[in-house]
């Protein structure tokens, strides 16, 4: 699991966490390669744990970076929680890495960066389309969409 910031490249002044006009996206990466994303109002512990509680089963082993918003997951009942310390230039260790979700962030930012001027109200739909395409990257999306339309006609 990880969070990422989406929005205009750089505006004078604020950068990184708390950059004014950026949208915060929280992402979960399952070991089978599937991603779930959700736009969150902030990256505080309470907000992130609400999403985690709703989407992650208690017997899961959690891998994250060292962001303080992830502290206390074992106390909530999760089996194990491994961290990598990005702040200390650690991106993988013997038991943990979050390269899967980092790969999705790179894919999403590259894909969404090609669309100039996404309105904030439409960002959610573009993000979910990107999530869908990433989750079905090995499938024939055309055939998959035809199948979905046959099952649930408009």
Where are these regions (language model features)?
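Residue-level recognition of single "structural anchor" positions
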Residues: 1-154
């Amino acid at each position: 699991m990880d969070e990422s910031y989406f929005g205009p490249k750089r505006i004078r002044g604020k950068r990184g966490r708390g950059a004014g006009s950026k949208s915060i996206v929280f992402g979960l990466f399952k070991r089978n390669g599937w991603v779930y994303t959700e736009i969150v109002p902030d990256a505080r512990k309470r907000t992130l744990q609400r999403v985690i509680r709703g989407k992650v089963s208690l017997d899961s082993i959690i891998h994250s970076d060292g962001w303080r918003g992830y502290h206390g997951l074992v106390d909530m009942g999760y089996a194990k929680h491994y961290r990598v310390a990005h702040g200390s230039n650690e991106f993988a260790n013997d038991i943990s890495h979050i390269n899967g979700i980092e790969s999705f962030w790179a894919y999403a930012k590259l894909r969404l960066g090609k669309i100039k001027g996404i309105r904030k109200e439409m960002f959610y739909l573009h993000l979910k389309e990107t999530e869908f395409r990433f989750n079905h990257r090995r499938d024939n999306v055309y055939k998959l969409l035809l199948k979905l339309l046959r099952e649930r006609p408009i």
